[in-house]
C-alpha cells in the first residue's frame, strides 16, 4: 500500500461533483418540507468551491446528498460520473472513503490521543500497522502538529483541533474534502490559519474542497467558485470574481455588503451629489485594481477632472475587486469620454448565472 500523502487516483471527470435538477423533500407531521428545489450545479475537479447561504438555505442537505447520507427526491447527484443514489451499500463504502469531512464542532474523540484520532479511519480501513504509522506521521507534519501527537483534544486550541480534524479527514487519501461550517467556531485569526491550510490541501494534494458556510469573508478568502443558496434555490453561481463583481441576486448583494461597501443608495447618492453639485457621479465596479488605475490614468488625458468620493477594494481568489463612485467634472465632451472609459471597466467581467427565486412555501433545512 502506497503511503504518499496525495489522494488516491480516481476517474478524471472534469466535473467532480454534479447536481442535475436535484429536489429534496422531507415529510414532517406538518407536511412536506422542500429543502432543495431543482438545484443544478457542477463542481470542478481540483477546485475550491464555496456554497454560501443563511440558516435554512439547504446547505446541510446539499452536503448529505454528496456523501450519500440522503438521496434526492428528484434529480441526480453524480460523483466522478456515478449516480450516488444508485449505489448499493457495498459500493457506497469506497465512495465515502473517497470523501473526507470536517465539521464546526471538530467531532474528536476526547479520550484518545491526537495520534489515535488520526489513526481511527485507517483502522476502520484495515491499514497495515507500518503503513498506518507512516501515514499518521506524514499527516501530523502536514498540519503542523507533530509535537502534539500524544496530547489529548482538551489540551489543544480550537484551531489545533480543527487541524486534527483535517488530518483525520485526509487519512484515507480522499479526493474530495467537505468543510461544513468548519471555521464558524473560530476567531478571525484562527479562521485565517485554517483557511490557509485548506488552500494547501487543495494546491499541494489536488483535493477538491467544498466549503459550506454562511460567512462571506470565508468565501472571499478561499473560494475559486461560488454558489449561493436561498430557501433551497440556487440563486447564483459562477467564479468568485464574477459573483463578487456582478452579484445578480438580492441574497448575494446582502452577503457582499458585509465585506465590501456597495454603491451608494438613493439617500447617499443625493448627499454625494449635493457635495459635488457640478460633477457627474459614476458608479464603477472593477475586478482588478490596476484596471481601475489605468482607467483613471486615461481619464487624466481627456481634460476631465475626477475624484473618488465613495468606495473601497478587497482581495478575492484571483485578483482584487473594487466598488467606487467617481465624481467627474470639466467640459461636457471630456466628461462623456471619461464616462465611457469607466463603463469599459465595469463591463470587463462576465455576468454570473442567476435565477429568479420563487417565494418558498416551506422553510428549507
Curated annotation (Swiss-Prot):
Recorded name of the encoding gene: metN
Compartment(s) where it occurs, according to its Swiss-Prot or TrEMBL record: Cell membrane
Binding of ATP, residues: 53-60
The keyword ATP-binding is assigned to this record: yes
Originating species: Cutibacterium acnes (strain DSM 16379 / KPA171202)
Function as written in the Swiss-Prot or TrEMBL entry: Part of the ABC transporter complex MetNIQ involved in methionine import. Responsible for energy coupling to the transport system.
Family to which this protein belongs: Belongs to the ABC transporter superfamily. Methionine importer (TC 3.A.1.24) family.
GO function term, MF aspect, one: ABC-type D-methionine transporter activity
Domain ABC transporter: 17-256
Location of the region described as Disordered in the Swiss-Prot/TrEMBL record: 346-365
Catalytic activity: L-methionine(out) + ATP + H2O = L-methionine(in) + ADP + phosphate + H(+); D-methionine(out) + ATP + H2O = D-methionine(in) + ADP + phosphate + H(+)
Domain of life from the UniProt record: Bacteria
Its membrane topology: Peripheral membrane protein
Gene3D superfamilies: P-loop containing nucleotide triphosphate hydrolases
Name of the protein in question: Methionine import ATP-binding protein MetN
Record key words, sorted: Amino-acid transport, ATP-binding, Cell membrane, Membrane, Nucleotide-binding, Translocase, Transport
Subunit (UniProt): The complex is composed of two ATP-binding proteins (MetN), two transmembrane proteins (MetI) and a solute-binding protein (MetQ).
Pfam families: ABC_tran
This protein's record includes keyword Transport: yes
InterPro entries cross-referenced by the UniProt entry: AAA+_ATPase, ABC_transporter-like_ATP-bd, ABC_transporter-like_CS, MetN_ABC, MetN_ABC_transporter-like, P-loop_NTPase
GO cellular component, one term: plasma membrane
